[in-house]
Amino acid sequence: YIGYDRTAWAGTEDPELRITFDRNIRWRCDRLTLDMGDDGKRLLPEDQILMEVKTLGACPLWLCRALSAQHIYPASFSKYGACYKEMCREANAPARMTNSKEAHRCA
């Protein structure tokens, strides 16, 4: 289970622009049905928020400038991959990850 609290914004002039902010990203490996609540272990410190910018074309210049002024630059991050690594770390097992669609597990 992976849960997070999301705030989503969409462009008014560019409907293809979407920015999301995910807070309180949490995970668990038990109680996997949705009726078991939304608690879990934090993936990131409380003061960190994941921002994702989605657009079909190039990022608008005004947004590039605003992000650059705050020293925010593109980076890859996968909530699912990070949770998998944490799960393997807790199990004291090496994470076996690949870019393929094939499923892998902790060994």
What is each stretch, according to the model?
Residues 1-107:
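Phosphate-end processing signature that detects enzymes handling 5′-triphosphorylated RNA
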